Amino acid sequence: MANERSKLAFKKTFPVFKRFLQSKDLALVVFVIAILAIIIVPLPPFVLDFLLTISIALSVLIILIGLYIDKPTDFSAFPTLLLIVTLYRLALNVATTRMILTQGYKGPSAVSDIITAFGEFSVSGNYVIGAIIFSILVLVNLLVVTNGSTRVTEVRARFALDAMPGKQMAIDADLNSGLIDDKEAKKRRAALSQEADFYGAMDGASKFVKGDAIASIIITLINIIGGFLVGVFQRDMSLSFSASTFTILTIGDGLVGQIPALIIATATGIVATRTTQNEEEDFASKLITQLTNKSKTLVIVGAILLLFATIPGLPTFSLAFVGTLFLFIAWLISREGKDGLLTKLENYLSQKFGLDLSEKPHSSKIKPHTPTTRAKTQEELKREEEQAIDEVLKIEFLELALGYQLISLADMKQGGDLLERIRGIRKKIASDYGFLMPQIRIRDNLQLPPTHYEIKLKGIVIGEGMVMPDKFLAMNTGFVNKEIEGIPTKEPAFGMDALWIETKNKEEAIIQGYTIIDPSTVIATHTSELVKKYAEDFITKDEVKSLLERLAKDYPTIVEESKKIPTGAIRSVLQALLHEKIPIKDMLTILETITDIAPLVQNDVNILTEQVRARLSRVITNAFKSEDGRLKFLTFSTDSEQFLLNKLRENGTSKSLLLNVGELQKLIEVVSEEAMKVLQKGIAPVILIVEPNLRKALSNQMEQARIDVIVLSHAELDPNSNFEALGTIHINF
């Protein structure tokens, strides 16, 4: 009957226990409540031993996690965990103090076995030695480890916050150039925010460690003095026996608490001083590699130890053995070849003693086939010559030529990521503009200067630049606190002033507010901007066919109707849109407008384009919005706009402005001046809104004058969007 009741009780309680283990939040809450209970409730010795063991285990676990993480933010819970563990250890100090003062007179076994072991075994029962060891541990923890960890976390927190604007702009630059997508940008921004929050929290959490070390000293003094008074005045113990008993117990308690505290403080320093590691090499491997990287240093250490071994009075054997070991390791490292240290040792033992220690694969009895060579026939030689000529005559649609020092940027085996960034450009262009740019042919060109590159469209150079593959480009975007040294240059995509800086100065440049760009990104960004500039050239008839085929999968009827319209007319409309930076992503609206209007206007491209633009009002408005979601624009005064309307002249279906030299000069000067004022406010691009009849003619005039202004008409604005008028342009013609 009793067994059945036990089984029934177990059956009822086990699901509750299982849910408790599975609920991480509940387990943490119970742990914190248990810490508070430890402070209030007296504990028996075996429970106290159990809790002290957990304290030691937690400290070892934390320092091991700190050694194995790749970067500090992988242990983002560390600051909070540090607070909880510190509170737990202080609660144990209260519990052990209560136990020592109330039960210490009965003997060490009545308090705690762990405290007794540390008080008697670790210091041989000598409370003077124990006090000295405890003092050393406290001083090392407080003055060395804790102070260093606190200072490091303060500096890392300040540097992380100072570098945030530069890193944020670098993310925005990668996003704008198509190197990353929105998802990756959000991921990087979240990581950046997490890093700043982590170091900010670490700055405060490090103070817990320092306070814990100070509290340990005070608690130890209280235990010794309080225990002595309790033993003499309340328990009638002799002065010497009371001092010996309570001092040993207190020193044991101090060591049990101070060793985990020292480990936690060391873990804090390790986490705070860790940098991001190479994914292919962990911290321990990298540490050993760097320590044994130069055989010369090991030789010097070995020679110094051997020299010390010859000095009378010093331990000859120990010094000579360690010195010889250093020389042997240095000799192994200095041997030729790229094998690791263990492989070199294995090869040495194999050669020295005739041992075969390597793991060799089973040899095959089948001999490899050796191909025979023969003379090529005349037909084969002729065919190869024709193929070579065809290769020379072939014109690549889009080509990137690199100087020989830049080839490594496109070689993935050498760590180059230019190909990956070019692929990112294609995705970004397709996402933003609605067409798929052709593959970029990347080739080396020995005729170029070593660090130069050229971007060609149909064999014609449309852009060129220079990058230094072993340096970084630092750009001052207006947030620089202090200028740094570097080689002055011009950023090729936008013509901004920049500096080429050494790799070792990268972190300093970020801290000072520079936007840092690697060489591959410089080339990729330049390529991206040129593709946007010449976007209309990529709309071939084949590309139009591909766009229609993709649209036909979802909207076959409209594509079937569009077959009545000449492909050339559709292509011309798409090119006209891209020429003025209007995306063609909404092919459905574009094609519907063309099929509706084309029969009425005899496929006139100018009229079709303006009608399509009016239908794309939401797309156009969204394309030129500022970051705050507003379309910010300039307008002409009523009399200025009316004057320009009166100057319109029709040439068939197109219109142009018929202005004399003076009128044209005034128009260009005033618009340029107003556009510059807008750009100086950090607003780009500059939008100018005019009457629909005036838009195309004025846009052509601005393009001829090379004024970077987007001219829109009132008909192309989405009425549901937010707008902000920046000013009115008045021209005294």
UniProtKB/Swiss-Prot annotation:
GO biological process: bacterial-type flagellum assembly; protein secretion
UniProtKB keywords: Bacterial flagellum biogenesis, Bacterial flagellum protein export, Cell membrane, Membrane, Protein transport, Transmembrane, Transmembrane helix, Transport
One Pfam family in the UniProt entry: FHIPEP
UniProt cross-references to PROSITE patterns, sorted A to Z: FHIPEP
Residue ranges of the region described as Disordered: 360-381
Recorded topology in the membrane: Multi-pass membrane protein
Compartments reported by the entry: Cell membrane
One annotated Gene Ontology cellular component of this protein: plasma membrane
Transmembrane segments: 28-48, 49-69, 125-145, 213-233, 246-266, 291-311, 313-333
InterPro entries noted in UniProt: FHIPEP_1, FHIPEP_3, FHIPEP_4, FHIPEP_CS, FlhA, T3SS_FHIPEP
Family that this chain belongs to: Belongs to the FHIPEP (flagella/HR/invasion proteins export pore) family.
Role description: Involved in the export of flagellum proteins.
NCBIfam families (alphabetical): FlhA
Entry protein name: Flagellar biosynthesis protein FlhA
